[in-house]
Amino acid sequence: MNKLTEEQIQELYTFTHDHFVYHFDLQTELVDHLANGIEVLLLQHPNLLFNEALQMEFKKFGVFGFQEVVEERRKALNKKYLKIIFNFYKAYFTIPKIMLTVILTILLYTTLSSFTPNYQHSIIMVLYLSFFAIAFIRLIKYNTILKKKKHKWMLEEILLTQMGLFSLFQLPIHILNMPVEIESSYFLGLMSFFNVSIIILFYVMVFQIPSKAEDLLEKTYPEYKMTKTL
């Protein structure tokens, strides 16, 4: 079977980009799929031109072109991201971290118990808003790094922006839905544990996972390491 030339492969990358596929990882998958199909067509029809074979392969994607593939891939990577969060969160809770969680819960409970219900609500608000400010600054920094990169990666975009920002925007909602009066010590204890657990979850999502993003990308895409040297 005649293999496509490097120039033709680059044409396929340009073709996918022109059809609204901007992530290099997805472009590579589509280019590989298109190239295989085109090579088969050219073998079966030697007189067929490259562009004609390309259009024939593209028609197989239907009226919406690559968009359905893009959406399916995004859904799959979102599921992968949720699995990554779970694994990081699970790995985070070693014995020392469990002890730290208990200590932080007791500390928060003791602090809240020293104040009236209205002040308790204010303390929780300050706690969340402080974390929100720090995390938001970090996400802006990561987003700036993404924009400077030559290639966009869908998983990287999800890792560093979409899911992180989604988690942050849940904080104000969580704050607004909190009860103003917390009189039960049992409920106060549960709320202290819940808030500590939520903050640890956000810490893992905003700080731990982004710091390991390159390792995750290299494991997912072997070509990622190669593109860093280009």
Which residues are covered by each model-predicted region?
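C-terminal alpha-helix/helix-terminus motif
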Residues: 8, 61, 65-68, 217, ...
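Hydrophobic alpha-helical bundles in membrane proteins
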Residues: 86-230
